[in-house]
UniProtKB/Swiss-Prot annotation:
Database matches in Gene3D superfamilies: Aconitase, domain 4
SUPFAM superfamilies reported for this sequence: LeuD/IlvD-like (SSF52016)
Name under which the protein is recorded: 3-isopropylmalate dehydratase small subunit
GO cellular component: 3-isopropylmalate dehydratase complex
EC number: 4.2.1.33
Pfam family, one: Aconitase_C
Enzyme class: lyase
Quaternary structure and partners: Heterodimer of LeuC and LeuD.
Reactions performed catalytically: (2R,3S)-3-isopropylmalate = (2S)-2-isopropylmalate
Organism (species): Shewanella baltica (strain OS185)
GO molecular function per UniProt: 3-isopropylmalate dehydratase activity
């Protein structure tokens, strides 16, 4: 998993509340069990005018040329609600997004994102609105997300602080998923195993 320390990137917005996981990655695309290849189906029902995905919707932000290559997504309250599909952060990451900034997130999506290297940043509604306004006002506007200092820097230079559980921050800073986190304690695990009776191993 790619570590997340500081990232500066082009920002794109979807100015909607309650964006659920079925909109993020519709159910008909969930048959794969590997993490790659989901980006093309991200927000399928909004990005395309046809079921086959051959006709991009020119009105949808992710299809607009000014947002091509965006790596930071701005959204509104309760992002990632709905069913607990881990494919949702897989699709967002595979598309090239590194961070989602919104006033609030669904709990399960929030945890799944951290476990897959996607940083969910919760700011106030007013702060998210300011970021959206600045991004809308200037093509190519970039936002910086600094996990080392837990700050977001807007295109105009305004700074907003955010909080993240230290355990989640540690995993993201070091690029550790659940397996990687366990392996980082391999020496302690081995030491413990030598201290217990054989029949208990």
């Amino acid at each position: 998993m790619q570590p997340f320390t500081t990232h500066t990137g082009l920002a794109v917005m979807i100015d909607s509340t309650n964006i659920d996981t079925d909109q993020i990655i519709p159910k008909q695309f969930l048959s794969k069990v590997t993490r790659d290849g989901f980006g093309v189906h991200l927000f399928h029902d909004w990005r395309y005018l046809d079921d086959a995905g051959d006709q991009p919707n020119p009105e949808f932000s992710l299809n607009q040329s000014r947002y091509k290559g965006a790596s930071i997504l701005l959204a509104q309250e309760n992002f990632g609600c709905g069913s607990s599909r881990e494919h949702a952060p897989w699709a967002l990451v595979d598309f090239g997004l590194r961070a989602i900034i919104a006033p609030s997130f669904a709990d399960i999506f929030y945890g799944n994102s951290i476990n897959n290297g996607l940083l969910p940043v919760a700011l106030t509604h007013a702060q998210v609105r300011q970021l959206m306004d600045e991004v809308a006002a200037e093509a190519g506007a970039q936002i910086t997300v600094d996990l080392t200092s837990c700050k977001v820097i807007s295109p105009s230079g305004a700074e907003f602080s955010f909080t993240l559980a230290e355990s989640a921050r540690h995993k993201l800073l070091n690029g550790l998923d659940a397996i990687g986190l366990t392996l980082s304690h391999a020496a302690q695990i081995s030491q413990y195993e030598t201290q217990i009776q054989g029949w208990r191993r």
